[in-house]
């Protein structure tokens, strides 16, 4: 499974995988949104929940918005992002976004969308006391289910989809 593809929570709910990562000890994890991993500890790669992705290894939300799922099968951890046109992009490193940078976002509801970074270190109040700070702000659209998906530029990982306003028909901020 690659970045941007759908992941399914035990008991219901769908998010998107951001990037597959490896620890210094060689363990592989799926990186996604923390508001996703907080709702379930077991995750699957299919909606019928017959193909196990793995179990939650950690969640940081609110404050931050990221979570780690330990892969049950390390060979399933694809180092690419799915571009929703039948092809994939190799991700070879991580970097820091900058204002004006052209970026792409891959997610399981709306696929691949492009735009620019419009701000850094943004803070968003999602309500109910859920405040997340240190975010990259873009003019790339997103919709529910895109959460956790990959934000990247070329072969460089930049971040994960946390949330946004608007949608991919009329546009929005993510």
UniProtKB/Swiss-Prot annotation:
Gene3D superfamilies: Trypsin-like serine proteases. It is found in: Secreted. Its EC number is 3.4.21.-. The keyword Aminoacyl-tRNA synthetase does not apply. InterPro entries: Pept_S1A_streptogrisin, Peptidase_S1_PA, Peptidase_S1_PA_chymotrypsin, Trypsin_dom, TRYPSIN_HIS, TRYPSIN_SER. Disulfide bonds join 15-36, 141-168. It holds the Pfam family Trypsin. GO terms for molecular function: serine-type endopeptidase activity. The active site is at 35 (charge relay system), 65 (charge relay system), 147 (charge relay system). One of its GO terms (biological process) is proteolysis. Keywords: Disulfide bond, Hydrolase, Protease, Secreted, Serine protease. One of its GO terms (cellular component) is extracellular region. The keyword Glycoprotein does not apply. It is an enzyme of class 3 (hydrolase). Belongs to the peptidase S1 family. This is Serine protease 2.
């Amino acid at each position: 499974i690659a970045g941007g593809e759908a992941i399914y929570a035990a008991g219901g709910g769908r998010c998107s995988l951001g990037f597959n990562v490896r620890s210094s000890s060689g363990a592989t994890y799926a990186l996604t949104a923390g508001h996703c991993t907080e709702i379930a500890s077991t995750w699957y790669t299919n909606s019928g929940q017959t193909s196990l992705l793995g179990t939650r290894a950690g969640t940081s939300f609110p404050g931050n918005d990221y979570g780690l799922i330990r892969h049950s099968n390390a060979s399933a951890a694809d180092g690419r992002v799915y571009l929703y046109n039948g092809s994939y992009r190799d991700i070879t490193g991580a970097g820091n976004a900058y204002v004006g940078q052209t970026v792409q976002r891959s997610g399981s509801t709306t696929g691949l969308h492009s735009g620019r970074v419009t701000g850094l270190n943004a803070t968003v109040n999602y309500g109910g006391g859920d405040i997340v700070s240190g975010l990259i702000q873009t003019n790339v659209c997103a919709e529910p289910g895109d959460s956790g998906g990959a934000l990247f530029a070329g072969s460089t990982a930049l971040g994960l989809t946390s949330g946004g306003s608007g949608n991919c028909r009329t546009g929005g901020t993510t």
